[in-house]
Curated annotation (Swiss-Prot):
InterPro entries: ATP_synth_b/b'su_bac/chlpt (IPR002146). This is ATP synthase subunit b, chloroplastic. The chain crosses the membrane at residues 27-49. It is a single-pass membrane protein. Belongs to the ATPase B chain family. The keyword Iron does not apply. It comes from Nymphaea alba. The lineage of its organism: Eukaryota, Viridiplantae, Streptophyta, Embryophyta, Tracheophyta. Its main location: plastid. It comes from the Eukaryota. GO terms for molecular function: proton-transporting ATP synthase activity, rotational mechanism. The gene is atpF.
Length: 184
């Protein structure tokens, strides 16, 4: 009876007829079936697997090449950018130096022009002062001369009588006659 019940228990574990299933119990499977399945998998799977690996390898190599090309392009662009930066820095330094020297030159030109203007103004001032002094001196001399002349005329008119007047005229005529003889 025990055998009979064991038979029924095993029937419950077996797959039904016409269906396909895997027996995961290694000890219960047939080694020949396993070797056949593994052989078929290796034979057919090897090509598929090698194709998959080759494709993956090609994609990886292509990605590496693209990355290297991009890296090379980036390095080239970086070098160009550095060269442009150095050029711009040199130009900026030249502009800065030239700008400072031009500013200094312009500053010196303005200072020199200011000194020249000051010298001209000083000369004009001195000339104006000298001119005004000469004019003042001339005015004073004219006034002194006029006053002296008026004083002399007043004195002469007071002191001069007819006889003295005739003697003065005679003396002057004598001087003029002597001068005429010398010039002839």
């Amino acid at each position: 009876m025990k055998n009979l019940t064991d038979s029924f228990v095993f029937l419950g574990h077996w797959p039904s007829a016409g269906s396909f299933g895997f027996n995961t119990d290694i000890l219960a499977t047939n080694l020949i079936n396993l070797s056949v399945v593994l052989g078929v998998l290796i034979f057919f799977g090897k090509g598929v697997l090698s194709d998959l690996l080759d494709n993956r390898k090609q994609r990886i190599l292509s990605t590496i090449r693209n990355s290297e090309e991009l890296c090379g392009g980036a390095v080239e662009q970086l070098e160009k950018a550095r060269a442009r930066l150095r050029k711009v820095e040199r130009e900026a330094e030249e502009f800065r130096v030239n700008g400072y020297s031009e500013i200094e030159q312009e500053k010196m030109n303005l200072i020199n022009a200011a000194y020249q203007n000051l010298e001209q103004l000083e000369n004009y001032k001195n000339e104006t002062i000298h001119f005004e002094q000469q004019r003042a001196i001339n005015q004073v001399q004219q006034r002194v001369f006029q006053q002296a002349l008026q004083g002399a005329l007043g004195t002469l008119n007071n002191c001069l009588n007819g006889e003295l007047h005739l003697r003065t005229i005679g003396a002057n005529i004598g001087i003029l006659g002597a001068m005429k003889e010398i010039t002839d």
